[in-house]
């Protein structure tokens, strides 16, 4: 049977509200007939139609879309055997740049001047009366701060932290709520607005009021009546405002304080507010944060001070939900931590200044509470103020609404646990933006983390909306001289803005590497076109610092090491200054990589002159690396793992010395007892550098090593996510790290070294795209260690790839499901290749 299995608008299967004038419509197909191909797809949107004969998406290019309108979408597909299939969906246009009738409002009497804390949440209220039958009603809302909307006491929508985290000086999202069925005729519309990222304390300096001096609200209720008339009720000076709501404190780091006995009083008129910024206000285009998995505690303990400790057996980003019978005035506190002290109490040392505490003052009777304006990174929760026997408690995971589209499993259960840790690390740090960690006073959009992790992330999740949203901010935050800030959105931490033409290797590389990873996973040119000028400016800034040398030194990146991260958190040296001291190697390899990748992108976009220019630049940088930083015979002048990994993976060594360089890397690995020695730049690539250069056995010995530092050491000592530091806990469960110049930079939920996940999919499982978007892909497992079988799925624009292999009795059995519209090259152990069209196949060969 020929079927349409997926039909999306702007990557959403349902519920899309967009301001895009040319929304993208995507689809995937399935068939039980081998070799099935799409012959024609007729796409109809309203009165417009077009035909698609290749690819899996098309942009709407019909008559201008009207605002506030629902459009039907219909797809009629025909395969090459004449079978047909039909699917329908719909989307809604938002405001489409319609001027707002509502005005920004705030409380001018609230003067928020305290440092390093967040403001008291504001509550806005409007009584609304309607007296005619309603055909359709939509609420459009946004804020400076983070908000929740209620209609007659009922929360609207499922999103946490609306309107989301963006580069507020450039972009601000608004949300759309269908309230047609909720309006009664006499209604109360209420908003609670906390400080969030725009006004509240943020970054490790706890800077506040970065974007606005106080919270502000912009909203419109647009009602279409049955008689054809329309009424718009917008925010203005007739709205009421108060700071006496039940949410007494809300801070992204410190947590939330809620007083259920608090009656909202002191209502007074709001007033128009003039913002310090003028962002483009656009319908949601990212992936909003929502509640996902709910976990119950697996163990309950009592700390020495009497605090009840709950173990949820999983480190995560989220909140607790408590339910109990309380008395008015009773105070319950919930603290959060990733690890315990030896005495069983919560270890909150590594939260630094983040208090990560929820405080709840009870009313009489049964009650349920869960924070709405903060989140924490935790495995353990400590509760005081209520007896354990009287309390029901759950941990609720919060992360962006991204589809979990990939899976990996093999015969080694420790690797399966590593895969789980990687995906939980991703979910914990996909909280509206890609963050570094979810627990301490940071949770920032560090560019280096997602730069190295994005290929792994895209094997596990469908991230088009999530990453495209963040990349808009990368583009917006780029410095005039080309550098990319280390954290995006900047929001109070602007390094390297202080340096002319400043660029930071591997961190700034995110502007090239993340779009490239997204293109490889999806085949979409949109992100490459959007980011191409940004990439060009960035590579130019990198070249500025590489241009100070003379002769063969000209293409060596010469920025002082203190302005780099270098071989960040490499476990073979103990100090931050030592990681940074390796920057000449990491930065020069970075420039080779970004310029080489930019050459590929230029070619894809049809910019042939640019492609030739960047390809030549990449070659010159590679030559300089080998001339200046090696002896010319495959040995680096300073020997450490990353110094070999990067040029091997990036193919920088001449062919006649590559094998020698790989042997030298193997010697370092063997000398280190197959333990990892790379920092952020080298860790994603070390297993590829070994396996793809004839040393798969060494790669597997490193992958399967259980001694510290290694991926499976973390698994062996009980990790449930990936750590920032390889030696975060010793065999006794205690942190052995002393003063290393990083100010207690120890996180147990940091996905960067989980970038090894790409190796699990590409080499252990063996699925890798050979053409962007997996239109063509190969299934070529690299067998090693004691692994006897592996299976997994990979989500693609064409459908789901399913692949599995198993070795038994000297024979290898390989099975693969190839989506309609794609082609798979199966590589057998003998290196023989079989090219397969769509369908399901089983191939056997001598192992």
What is the role of each PLM region?
Residues 84, 121, 142, 170-172, ...:
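Active-site-proximal structural scaffolding
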Residues 189, 258, 441-442, 447, ...:
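C-terminal capping/lid segments that line or modulate ligand- or cofactor-binding pockets
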Residues 146, 236-238, 242, 390-421, ...:
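Active-site acid/base region of carbohydrate-active enzymes
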Residues 209, 213-220, 232-263, 282-293, ...:
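Non-catalytic C-terminal accessory modules of carbohydrate-active enzymes
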Residues 230, 308, 367, 636, ...:
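Hydrophobic residues embedded in beta-strands of well-ordered beta-sheets
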Residues 1-440, 448, 465-468, 481, ...:
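Extracellular/oxidizing-compartment recognition motifs
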Residues 137-141, 151, 319-338, 373, ...:
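Alpha-helical support elements that line or immediately flank enzyme active sites
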């Amino acid at each position: 049977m020929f079927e349409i299995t997926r039909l999306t608008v702007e990557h959403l299967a349902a519920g899309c509200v967009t301001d895009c004038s040319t929304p993208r419509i995507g689809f995937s197909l399935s068939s039980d007939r081998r070799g099935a191909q799409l012959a024609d797809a007729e796409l109809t949107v309203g009165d417009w139609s077009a035909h698609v004969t290749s690819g899996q998406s098309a942009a709407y290019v019909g008559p201008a879309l009207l605002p506030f309108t629902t459009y039907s979408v219909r797809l009629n597909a025909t395969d090459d055997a004449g079978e047909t299939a039909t699917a329908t969906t719909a989307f809604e246009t938002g405001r489409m740049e319609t001027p707002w009738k509502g005005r920004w409002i705030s409380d001018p009497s609230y003067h928020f001047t305290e440092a390093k804390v967040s403001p008291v949440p504001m509550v806005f209220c409007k009584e609304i009366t309607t007296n005619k039958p309603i055909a359709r009603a939509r609420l459009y809302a946004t804020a400076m701060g983070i908000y929740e909307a209620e209609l007659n006491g009922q929360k609207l929508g499922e999103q946490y932290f609306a309107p989301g985290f963006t580069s507020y000086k450039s972009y601000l999202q608004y949300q759309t709520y269908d309230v047609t069925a909720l309006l009664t005729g006499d209604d109360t519309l209420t908003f609670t607005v906390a400080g969030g990222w725009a006004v509240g304390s943020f970054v490790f300096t706890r800077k506040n009021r970065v974007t606005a001096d106080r919270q502000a609200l912009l909203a419109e209720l647009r009602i279409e009546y049955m008689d054809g008339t329309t009424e718009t009720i917008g925010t203005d000076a007739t709205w009421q405002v108060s700071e006496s709501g039940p949410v007494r404190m809300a801070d992204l780091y410190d947590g939330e304080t809620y007083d259920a006995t608090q009656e909202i009083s002191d209502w007074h008129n709001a007033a128009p507010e003039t913002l310090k910024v003028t962002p483009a206000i656009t319908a949601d285009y990212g992936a909003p944060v929502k509640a996902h998995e709910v976990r119950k505690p697996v163990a309950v303990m009592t700390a020495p001070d009497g605090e009840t400790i709950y173990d949820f057996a999983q480190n995560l980003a989220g909140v607790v939900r408590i339910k109990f019978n309380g008395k008015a005035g009773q105070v319950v506190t919930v603290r959060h931590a990733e690890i315990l002290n030896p005495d069983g109490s919560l270890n909150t040392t590594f939260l630094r200044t983040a208090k990560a505490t929820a405080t709840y003052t009870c009313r009489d009777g049964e009650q349920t509470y869960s924070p709405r304006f903060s989140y924490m990174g935790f495995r353990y929760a400590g509760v005081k103020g209520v007896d354990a026997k009287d309390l029901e408690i759950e941990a609720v995971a919060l992360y962006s609404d991204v589809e979990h589209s990939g899976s990996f499993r093999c015969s080694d259960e420790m690797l399966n646990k590593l895969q789980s840790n990687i995906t939980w690390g991703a979910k914990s740090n996909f909280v509206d933006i890609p963050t570094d960690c979810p627990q301490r006073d940071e949770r920032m959009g560090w560019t280096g983390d997602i730069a190295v992790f994005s290929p792994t992330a895209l094997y596990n999740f469908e991230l088009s909306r999530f990453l495209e949203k963040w990349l808009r901010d990368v583009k917006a935050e780029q410095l005039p001289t080309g550098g990319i800030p280390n954290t995006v959105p900047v929001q109070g931490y602007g390094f390297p803005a202080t340096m002319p033409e400043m660029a930071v290797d591997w961190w700034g590389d995110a502007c090239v590497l993340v779009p490239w990873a997204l293109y490889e996973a999806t085949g979409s040119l949109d992100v490459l076109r959007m980011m191409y000028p940004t990439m060009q400016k960035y590579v130019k800034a990198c070249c500025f610092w590489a241009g100070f040398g003379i002769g063969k030194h000209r293409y060596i990146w010469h920025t002082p090491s203190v302005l780099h991260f270098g071989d960040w958190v490499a476990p073979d040296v103990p100090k931050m200054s030592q990681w940074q001291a390796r920057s000449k190697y990491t930065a020069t390899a970075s420039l080779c990589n970004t310029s080489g990748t930019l050459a590929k992108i230029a070619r894809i976009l049809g910019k042939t002159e640019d492609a030739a220019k960047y390809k030549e630049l990449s070659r010159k940088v590679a030559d300089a690396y080998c001339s200046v930083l090696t002896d010319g015979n495959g040995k680096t002048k300073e020997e450490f793992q990353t110094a070999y990994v990067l040029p091997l993976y990036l193919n920088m060594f001449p062919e006649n010395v590559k094998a020698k360089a790989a042997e030298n890397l193997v010697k370092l690995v063997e000398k280190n007892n197959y333990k990892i020695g790379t920092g952020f730049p080298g860790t994603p690539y070390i297993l590829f550098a070994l396996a793809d250069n004839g040393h798969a056995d060494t790669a597997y010995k490193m992958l399967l090593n259980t001694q510290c530092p290694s991926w499976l050491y973390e698994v062996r000592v009980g990790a449930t996510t990936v750590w920032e530091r390889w030696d975060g806990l010793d065999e006794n469960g205690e942190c052995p790290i002393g003063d290393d110049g990083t100010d207690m930079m120890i996180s147990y939920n940091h996905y960067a070294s989980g970038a090894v996940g790409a190796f699990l999919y590409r080499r252990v499982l063996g699925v890798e795209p050979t053409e962007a978007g997996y239109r063509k892909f190969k299934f070529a497992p690299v067998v090693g260690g004691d692994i006897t079988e592996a299976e997994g799925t990979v989500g693609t624009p064409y459908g789901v790839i399913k692949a599995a292999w198993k070795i038994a009795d000297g024979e290898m059995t390989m099975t693969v499901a190839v989506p309609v519209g794609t082609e798979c090259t199966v590589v057998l152990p003998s290196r023989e290749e079989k090219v397969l069209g769509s369908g399901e196949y089983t191939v056997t060969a001598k192992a």
